[in-house]
């Protein structure tokens, strides 16, 4: 089950896991576990990742289609 989009965002921005690990002050193995969805970052780490990558936290946990569909559902009610 895919729970986060960190890998996709890293790929889109051309950023390596090693680079992110260094800027997050985490081990490569920790970041790799996030990227491979073996473990999930806590909210504090997710916020740090979003700031480092320059994206909204929502971009790390859902793709554009999911956000679009979610907005459609909210607007119909």
Predicted regions and their residues:
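Short basic helix-loop element that most often maps to the first helix and adjoining turn
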Residues: 4-23
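Key DNA-contact positions within bacterial/archaeal DNA-binding proteins
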Residues: 18, 29, 58
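Alpha-helical residues within the helix-turn-helix
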Residues: 22, 33, 51
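Recognition helix of helix-turn-helix/homeodomain-like DNA-binding domains
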Residues: 25-40
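DNA major-groove recognition helix of helix-turn-helix/homeodomain DNA-binding modules
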Residues: 44-59
């Amino acid at each position: 089950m895919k729970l986060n989009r960190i890998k996709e965002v890293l790929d889109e921005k051309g950023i390596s896991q090693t680079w992110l690990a260094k800027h997050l002050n985490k081990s490569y193995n920790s970041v790799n576990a996030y990227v491979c969805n073996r473990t999930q970052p806590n909210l504090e780490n997710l916020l740090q990742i979003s700031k480092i990558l320059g994206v909204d936290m929502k971009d790390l946990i859902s793709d554009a289609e999911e956000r679009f569909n979610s907005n459609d559902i909210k607007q119909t009610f």
